[in-house]
Amino acid sequence: MSVAPLKNDVFLRALLREPVPYTPIWLMRQAGRYLPEYNATRARAGSFMGLAQNPDYACEVTLQPLARYPLDAAILFSDILTVPHAMGLGLDFAPGEGPRFAHPVRDESDVAKLAVPDMDSLRYVFDAVRTIRRELDGRVPLIGFAGSPWTIACYMAEGRGSDDYRLIKSMLYGRPDLLHRILEINAEATRHYLNAQIDAGAQAVMLFDSWGGVLADGLFQQFSLAYTRRVVEGLTREREGRRVPVIVFTKGGGQWLEEIAACGCDAVGLDWTVNLGAARRRVTDAVALQGNLDPMTLFGGAQAVRAEARRTLDAFGPVGKGGHVFNLGHGISQYSPPEVVSELVDEVHTYSRALHAG
């Protein structure tokens, strides 16, 4: 596939801690339910899976936030649970309930059935990547993504989201051998999955370790970070003559920043509970940092959003050699006012230009 030259590479350069004229911004879940146009497209698709498995619809919703806001990156519209769905677990999104699996993995016989899926069963994702790259026409880079081996294992064992992670932790403490087997398969599948996204045209990739923070110290390193590192070490790191940066985001992982930064990634995502300046000192500019505005700030109105954006940028400190990508500390809420997002993007671009020029 012939691709257009990249017109705005500020996001990629920031991830590699190269000089940039301003701090780039994109938002986790930027293509989502807070946008009326997303909801209209989802209604046409008939269901979440109908949306995610149709490359044209996936492309349409991926591009919707870029039509509204001058964001510095697009992120593939998909879901972290596509990989276990391809393993045969039967993913479904029930209205008002979120994702659930028809065939959760809870005992030895379930684990014995697991295998790395044929990537051809995920072709709709890679077709979407190619379609989005074509339609972006070099406007901004495209981010591919996957869930971390631990996070998707949580969903696989629980069968849905969880408040206490009782089932996955029962396996962790009672049959760690089974959990390690699941994680080995997940890591191998995720490596293949992200590399296929890169081959299809993703210019950066992100690993969402959404539930790493529910683990105790010591267990995080053993059951989450070790398998995240395994994925990162197996990724294609150069394509189209450029490095393909890797971002790792562990929600609730603030106490392990130094260890996460050493896993081989180019950038570490931060949730809103972490002091950005302190995080930068802890990782000593060895990696870029992404984040970390509290998503609930968007409900405080334009003035509060602009003030908090400036505070976040100031917290990072002198731009120097440190790379910073502005983002929320978690995904944007479906109830966020779209007009306030405009205020956020404008403030980040305007205020950070002055910081970088100074």
Swiss-Prot record:
Gene: hemE
Organism whose genome encodes this protein: Bordetella pertussis (strain Tohama I / ATCC BAA-589 / NCTC 13251)
Catalyzed reaction equations: uroporphyrinogen III + 4 H(+) = coproporphyrinogen III + 4 CO2
SUPFAM superfamilies: UROD/MetE-like
Assembly information from the UniProt record: Homodimer.
Gene Ontology terms: biological process: protoporphyrinogen IX biosynthetic process from glutamate
A Pfam family of this chain: URO-D
Keyword match Cytoplasm: yes
The protein's role, per its UniProt record: Catalyzes the decarboxylation of four acetate groups of uroporphyrinogen-III to yield coproporphyrinogen-III.
Gene Ontology CC annotations of this record: cytosol
Family per record: Belongs to the uroporphyrinogen decarboxylase family.
Keywords tagged on the record: Cytoplasm, Decarboxylase, Lyase, Porphyrin biosynthesis
Pathway membership: Porphyrin-containing compound metabolism; protoporphyrin-IX biosynthesis; coproporphyrinogen-III from 5-aminolevulinate: step 4/4
Site (Transition state stabilizer): D79
E.C. designation(s): 4.1.1.37
Name of protein: Uroporphyrinogen decarboxylase
